[in-house]
C-alpha cells in the first residue's frame, strides 16, 4: 500500500511498471503487479510470489557481503563477476532492470531488491531474479515546484545501486540493448498517466499529471536516442534531466 507522504502513489507505480515491462520484456523477466482498490486511501498492489518451496531469492547484498570486493573493482563489475563465477551471465538482466528504473525514475533500487534465484535444496544458482519492487518512482516524493528529473543519492554509501547519480547507470552500464525495441514505448506516457488518474491525490493536483507525462516522454526520447547511438557505434551521454526538465519538458509536451 502507499504512504501519504508519497500521495499513495506506490501501488499505482507498481501497476505502471508492470505495464512498461509487458511492453519491453519477456514474461519471465518481471513480476507482474495488479492494482487493488480497497476504498479511499486503501489502494494496494498484489502479485504472485516469485519464489516457491523449490526456489529462494538471494539479494545482491548477500553477494556483496559474501566476498571481499577489490578496491579497483566497481560495484557493477563486482556483481556481474560474482554471478559469472556461478555460471550466470546477468549483464542483460541488469540492463533490463536499469532501463525500467530509468524510465520509471525509480529512486529506490537498492542491493536488497535485485539479485538471483537459487534451488532451495541443491543451492544451484538459477537465473537472475525478475524485476520487482518499483513503487518508489515517478516523482511521488517531489512537489510540483521541484524538477521532475533524475535522483542523486546523498552519499557514496547509499549507491542506488551502481552510481550516486542514478541516471548515469544507463550510460555506463547499458551498452548493448540488443533486446530493446524503443518503438514499444510509443503511448506509454499516456498509458501511465491514465493509471495515475485513478488516484485523486494526483489527478486533482493541477498540472501534476501533465508534468509526469512530459517527464516520462522526455526519458523515453532520451533512451531511444541512446539506443540508436549505441547501434551506430557512437558514444552518447544520457542527458541531465534535472537541467532539462524546465525547457525540454515543455518541448516534450508539444509532441505528446
Describe the predicted segments one by one.
Residues 1-65:
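Conserved ATP-binding subdomain of kinase catalytic cores across diverse folds
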Amino acid at each position: 500500500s502507499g504512504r501519504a507522504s508519497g500521495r499513495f502513489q506506490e501501488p499505482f507505480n507498481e501497476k505502471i511498471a508492470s505495464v512498461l515491462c509487458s511492453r519491453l520484456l519477456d514474461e519471465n523477466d518481471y513480476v507482474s503487479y495488479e492494482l487493488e482498490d480497497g476504498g479511499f486511501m486503501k489502494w494496494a498492489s498484489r502479485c504472485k510470489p516469485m519464489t516457491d518451496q523449490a526456489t529462494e531469492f538471494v539479494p545482491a547484498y548477500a553477494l556483496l557481503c559474501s566476498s571481499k570486493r577489490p578496491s579497483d573493482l566497481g560495484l557493477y563489475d563486482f556483481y556481474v563477476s560474482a554471478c559469472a563465477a556461478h555460471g550466470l551471465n546477468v549483464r542483460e538482466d541488469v540492463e533490463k532492470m536499469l532501463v525500467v528504473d530509468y524510465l520509471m525514475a525509480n529512486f529506490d533500487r537498492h542491493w536488497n531488491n535485485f539479485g538471483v534465484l537459487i534451488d532451495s535444496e541443491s543451492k544451484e544458482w538459477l537465473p537472475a531474479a525478475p524485476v520487482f519492487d518499483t513503487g518508489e518512482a515517478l516523482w511521488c516524493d517531489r512537489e510540483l515546484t521541484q524538477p521532475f528529473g533524475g535522483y542523486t543519492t546523498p552519499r557514496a554509501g547509499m549507491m542506488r545501486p551502481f552510481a550516486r547519480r542514478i541516471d548515469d547507470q544507463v550510460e555506463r552500464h547499458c551498452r548493448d540493448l540488443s533486446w530493446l525495441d524503443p518503438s514499444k514505448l510509443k503511448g506509454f506516457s499516456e498509458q501511465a498517466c491514465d493509471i495515475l488518474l485513478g488516484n485523486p491525490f494526483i489527478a486533482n493536483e493541477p498540472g501534476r499529471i501533465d508534468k509526469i507525462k512530459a517527464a516520462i516522454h522526455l526519458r523515453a526520447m532520451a533512451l531511444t536516442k541512446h539506443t540508436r547511438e549505441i547501434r551506430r557505434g557512437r558514444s552518447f551521454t544520457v542527458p541531465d534531466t534535472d537541467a532539462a526538465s524546465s525547457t525540454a519538458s515543455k518541448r516534450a509536451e508539444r509532441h505528446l
